[in-house]
Swiss-Prot record:
It catalyses: L-glutamyl-tRNA(Gln) + L-glutamine + ATP + H2O = L-glutaminyl-tRNA(Gln) + L-glutamate + ADP + phosphate + H(+); L-aspartyl-tRNA(Asn) + L-glutamine + ATP + H2O = L-asparaginyl-tRNA(Asn) + L-glutamate + ADP + phosphate + 2 H(+). One of its GO terms (biological process) is glutaminyl-tRNAGln biosynthesis via transamidation. This is Aspartyl/glutamyl-tRNA(Asn/Gln) amidotransferase subunit B. It is an enzyme of class 6 (ligase). Belongs to the GatB/GatE family. GatB subfamily. The keyword ATP-binding applies. InterPro entries: Asn/Gln-tRNA_amidoTrfase_suB/E (IPR017959), Asn/Gln-tRNA_Trfase_suB/E_cat (IPR006075), Asn/Gln_amidotransferase (IPR018027), Asn/Gln_tRNA_amidoTrase-B-like (IPR003789), GatB (IPR004413), GatB_C_1 (IPR042114), GatB_Yqey_C_2 (IPR023168), Gln-tRNA_amidoTrfase_suB_CS (IPR017958). Pfam families: GatB_N (PF02934), GatB_Yqey (PF02637). Allows the formation of correctly charged Asn-tRNA(Asn) or Gln-tRNA(Gln) through the transamidation of misacylated Asp-tRNA(Asn) or Glu-tRNA(Gln) in organisms which lack either or both of asparaginyl-tRNA or glutaminyl-tRNA synthetases. The reaction takes place in the presence of glutamine and ATP through an activated phospho-Asp-tRNA(Asn) or phospho-Glu-tRNA(Gln). It comes from the Bacteria. It comes from Staphylococcus aureus (strain bovine RF122 / ET3-1).
Length: 475
């Protein structure tokens, strides 16, 4: 029997507001424990929540960017559960009247475009954070009350790879809107995954398991891959899948049972009596819609249709707004479009990954990168020399030409000097000269390599090719 995988994702995104969802406390990451709290966050008797209008605006902006319908009337509800980092013993969320519904995003997998539906986007407050140490636990309520949006996909995802692509695209769109940093390492983007299997051709969904502790997109993919295999083996062996919550163990790559999954009835939702419903008229919707910036799909189309970039380049460059903005600014400084794309996707990304830094944490600027690329364009600097210059340019900033000169990397373009390298290579490699004369094209490449090696990569490659052909024809 063959099974079809059915996946739905629930993504929590922390909104980048200055204050919390229902209190004036700061909503900043990294403060001393319990320093960003007040009487509302601590659930003192008699205090009342006040809705953060900026958070509502940003929830609407995100929903619109995800092609969602914005509710005319939306209300808040109490989700009841007890946990030490939830001092009210309930969370203010939205149940049956979310702010956004019926959206979608398009993802690309293996060159194919697929539309993934989004059921709803609702607002809620975050809980605090518990840290367990031995026989006791520490509670930090700085995060308590931080504004969140939860984005719930339709069960349209059919593989862990599609789940990864969905998360990548969702993060990109939210980042472009400016409503969140969407940094998993800081908790401003978190994901729970629901997965079930059903026999191919069957319409009824199988029993789902919810996966938690998915702290990176790779862990989402790996957790789903493991759970896919676990459920398939269980079903093939005649077993049943229980509705349960499971935790992904990073060290083993397996999922571990946490608890039997609760249903919405277990939370005893009821309308929040201390907050009146939101009434969102057309004027408010129009005002928010006008704040939506250019989104990744629009930029991607522009890069392909107006700048002539391949679709792959456009996809990579628009994955993050940071990279896309940097690309646009670099070509505005006069750098060649394709060379800039190649450097950002290649040398720049390689440097960022190797040093575990973000682009904006380096000394690289659109201006100094454009300066280096223009030196490559006009033949002043070879690509090989550029690779030696670039790490210092990224680490210290400055001017690529100056770095090249200071390190004795100036490209050799003097014909007399180059002829010495050329003739030396020809004298030392007579067999390659014969091979070239006999029509073996690879011999030319070999000889160029020998010349570049002898000149420590500083020979002007265009002149080398020209002079080498000239000298070969004489022999």
């Amino acid at each position: 029997m063959h099974f079809e995988t059915v996946i739905g994702l629930e993504v929590h995104v922390e909104l980048k507001t200055d204050s919390k969802m229902f209190s004036p406390s700061p909503a900043h990451f990294g403060a001393e424990p319990n320093s960003n709290t007040n009487v509302i966050d601590l659930a003192y008797p008699g205090v009342l929540p006040v809705v953060n209008k900026r958070a509502v605006d940003w929830a609407m902006r995100a929903a619109m960017a995800l092609n969602m319908e914005i509710a005319t009337e939306s209300k808040f509800d109490r989700k009841n559960y007890f946990y030490p980092d939830n001092p009210k013993a309930y969370q203010i969320s939205q149940f049956d009247q979310p702010i956004g519904e019926n959206g979608y995003i398009d993802i690309e997998v293996d060159g194919e475009t697929k539309r993934i539906g989004i059921t709803r986007l609702h607002m809620e407050e975050d809980a605090g954070k518990s840290t367990h140490k031995g026989e006791y636990s520490l509670v930090d309520l700085n995060r308590q009350g931080t504004p969140l949006i939860e984005i719930v996909s339709e069960p349209d995802i059919r593989s862990p790879i599609e789940a990864y692509a969905y998360l990548e695209k969702l993060r990109s769109i939210i980042q472009y809107t400016g409503v969140s940093d969407v940094k998993m390492e800081e908790g401003s983007l978190r994901c729970d995954a629901n997965i079930s299997l059903r026999p191919y051709g069957q319409e009824k969904f199988g029993t789902k398991a919810e996966l938690k502790n998915l702290n990176s997109f790779n862990y989402v993919r790996k957790g789903l891959e493991y759970e896919e295999k676990r459920q398939e083996e269980e079903l093939l062996n005649g077993g049943e899948i229980g509705q349960e919550t499971r935790r992904f163990d990073e060290s083993t790559g397996k999922t571990i049972l946490m608890r039997v999954k609760e249903g919405s009835d277990d939370y005893r939702y009821f309308p929040e009596p201390d907050i009146v419903p939101l009434y969102i008229d057309d004027a408010w919707k129009k005002r928010v819609r006008q704040t939506i910036p250019e989104l990744p799909d629009e930029r991607k189309a522009k890069y392909v249709n107006e700048l002539g970039l391949p679709a792959y380049d456009a996809h990579v460059l628009t994955l993050t707004k940071e990279m896309s903005d940097f690309f646009e600014s670099t070509i505005e400084h006069g750098a060649d479009v394709k060379l800039t794309s190649n450097w950002l996707m290649g040398g720049v990304n390689e440097y960022l990954n190797k040093n575990q830094v973000e682009l904006l944490d380096t000394k690289l600027t659109p201006e100094n990168l454009a300066g280096m690329i223009k030196l490559i364009e006009d033949g002043t600097m070879s690509s090989k020399i550029a690779k030696k210059v670039f790490p210092e340019l990224a680490a210290k900033g400055g001017n690529a030409k100056q770095i090249m000169e200071d390190n004795g990397l100036v490209q050799i373009s003097d014909e007399a000097t180059l002829l010495k390298f050329v003739n030396e290579a020809l004298d030392n490699n007579e067999q390659s000269v014969e091979d070239y004369k006999n029509g073996k094209g690879k011999a030319m490449g070999f000889l160029v390599g020998q010349i570049m090696k002898a000149s420590k990569g500083q020979a002007n490659p265009q002149l080398v090719n020209q002079l080498l052909k000239q000298e070969l024809d004489k022999r």
